[in-house]
Amino acid sequence: VEPNPAPRITIRYCTQCQWLLRSAWLAQELLQTFGPDLGEVALLPGTGGVFEIAYDGETIWERKADGGFPEAKVLKQRVRDRLDPERSLGHSDR
């Protein structure tokens, strides 16, 4: 049985809105928490107020639908629930 390939997380952000730093910070939070369990965290420049995070192509956060930007804790929980539902996130689970 082939192990599942490590997931790809994409963060599409609006360059006109200057959301690169926010995107990079969230990417760093995910990499710091999940490290080698993630295959890639990619930052994708966009326009038109876009801020969307996807896990292997499945949208897990969308700024307009979810009402703003995710807290790191909420984003980590959404990634964990797909990657390894049994994993404890320590203080991020409280």
Regions found by a protein language model. Give the residues of each.
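Domain-level signature for proteins that mediate thiol-based redox and metal-cofactor handling
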Residues: 1-94
